[in-house]
Amino acid sequence: MEEVVRFECRDSNLEIYVVQPGERLSIFGSCSFLCLAGNASINDYNLPAVSCESSNFMKISAPQRMDVPAILQVFKSGPSYKHARLKFRLKEVAPKNYEKIMEMIGTTEPSVFIFSKILDFAEETVSGVVSNFLIHSSIQKQIILPPHFFISRDDFIIYPQQQEAQLKSQMNRLNKLRNDGQRTTILPIGHKGAGKSNLMRSLVNRCLSNGYEHVYVLDCDIGQSEFTPCGCLSLTKVTSPILGKPHGHQRASFENSFFYGDITVRDINLYMDIFERLFNKFKVISEPGSVCIINSMGWVTDEGAEILDGITRVTDPELFVEIFRDQTEARYQFLNRAEHNIVEIFANNSIGVIGLPPQKRLPAALIRELTIVGYFSSRLPRPSLASFPKVAPYKLRFENVTICVPVDLLVEDSHVFSSINTQIMALCINNTDLKPRKLYGKDDLPSICVIDGNSPALQCIGFGIIRGVSVEERIIFVVTPVDLLKLEEPPVLVRGMRIQTPTMFYTADPYNRCPYVLNDLEQGNSDNTLDGLYQPSVNTTQFKRSRRF
């Protein structure tokens, strides 16, 4: 890369890159970076020129196994370029090279970046469970360790130029509405695999770059959630650009989130009820001039189209952005198409890194599992799932706990603890409309509640994994990033459909230690009512586990 020059810094984990205007770079892998000088953007977010301080670094996450790179573009700078300020900043980070760099720059106005090789905790944890996740192994051999990212000059453009211009024009129109204090809504739409999630992130970054101070994401993609593990609808205020994948920016606890309890919509009425609650919440808590970007599902036909029709009626978006990659895929049929502002984008497909064999894209189920790993990574003592058994769990006393189970997963009272042991559970706020009963009718045992079509929507504050159950101590052990000590009352434990603890939690430990506590009743317990109430799960091999009841 003759136009991209690299220099070493005083800190061996940092590198300086000098990139000339007009360059367009693709970045695969993960790293942190900042812009010392120049006019540049990353994934449609305009980068500020800042000093080299730890708080100014922004994380990029563009795993090669997830196909689409981060796009770094450099433009002409204009009169705001400060050579003297750049020299001062370079002297701080590269005292041995700053004069050489400034001599090379001369009177030109390139963008100057500092890249950090250090992975953040969540990224390192996730990259350890999927081979060739960040970058291909053949690239790793070409890079001085640690090989976490790779910069190429592939001129990859996601959105064609004409459609890019249309999108910019529409964003400028919305910006005028913002200046008038009007709240606006943007609805990106796309079939499965079209790149809708990347489009949603791009729209967030564009809004932040266009002067929006109040950007909200209403995430209703229960199968591929952005800020929570799957199964939730949520409203999140975004204050910084989204430059990574969901596993890297999970929130520990949620302020405005409801647990739908599945990765696909089986009850449209409940789904739309939750959606309307969250959109009404946006209208109540958002500031004048705010924008709400809706992360819809990649489902545009049949029931998916019915849901999009409902979302359109509730929100009346000021802008629709439809993205598609495959002309043979069915597309959404808009209601009253002529009345809407619609930008259609036929997106380009990423070809990966030139010269390397194409890698199979990760399946949706694995992406969901990686999001769960990223969510719990903040509780790990080190960035490896093998350290999960060392995480100290919270203790919840039986009499204070309510367990909610979908009707399809209901078991006999004697098997309740076995059915939730090791499972991931949504932590929800108690709702007076729930109709719980005590296990065996005993006050010192948990309450059990069946979730069916008549159950209320439950507000979700986070997720936890049942670490174990002690019938003797009357305690359930839960591992969660949520600070349960700050709650006024214990959360309701809610199990979802098709939302399970990832298998990698069981196989990551080379010593094959079970990731849960094993407690059993003492033989000859005087209370025969509890006999057989709990039998521990048994880890039979590193790759298979079975349950004994």
From Swiss-Prot:
Keywords: ATP-binding, Kinase, Nucleotide-binding, Nucleus, rRNA processing, Transferase. GO terms for molecular function: ATP binding; polynucleotide 5'-hydroxyl-kinase activity. The keyword ATP-binding applies. ATP binds at G190, H191, K192, G193, A194, G195, K196, S197. Signal peptide: none annotated. It is found in: Nucleus, Nucleolus. Coiled coil: none annotated. GO terms for cellular component: nucleolus; nucleus. The keyword Transmembrane helix does not apply. It is an enzyme of class 2 (transferase). GO terms for biological process: cleavage in ITS2 between 5.8S rRNA and LSU-rRNA of tricistronic rRNA transcript (SSU-rRNA, 5.8S rRNA, LSU-rRNA); rRNA processing. It comes from the Eukaryota. Pfam families: CLP1_P, NOL9_C. Its EC number is 2.7.1.-. Polynucleotide 5'-kinase involved in rRNA processing. Belongs to the Clp1 family. NOL9/GRC3 subfamily. This is Polynucleotide 5'-hydroxyl-kinase nol-9.
